[in-house]
Amino acid sequence: MDNTEKNSYVKNQITNALLRLLKEKELKDISISEITTTAQVSRISFYRNYNDKDTIIKEYIHLTLNEWNKNHPKTEEHTEDDILGDIFAYIIEYKDFYLLLRDRGIFYFLKDIIMDALGPKSEYPNFDAYTTAFIANGIYGWIEEWFLRGMQE
């Protein structure tokens, strides 16, 4: 195994360990030592790859998004309705993960991703920034309510 493969293996082990531990307890109650013990890697390996536990979750979300996008290529006539449909289809595909985030009170990680992707940018004029923030927060609220109602539609 070369260094890239080893690093990928370690990150995978750490991510899987954190996800297993999240099934048992809150994120705030999980220590780095528990993660590394469960992952069977050293603390040095943890800190070589991550700053904190939040980074693991954010990176996992980006990984799943990239994987989903790779498997669901966009067409040129991709409309706003298509984008919304894609968001919900992605969440359904990774439903267990997002239910785990919701159950552990850390669903806000999804909001961070939505705001990064669809929210206002610093170069936007004020009105455009306000409108974009309104829409992005509305989409997050819609998804959150959809989860609360059992993801029925």
Question: Where do the PLM segments sit?
Answer:
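Short, solvent-exposed positions on alpha-helices
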Residues: 59, 108, 130, 152-153
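An amphipathic alpha-helix adjacent to DNA-recognition modules
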Residues: 8-19, 23, 28-32, 37-40, ...
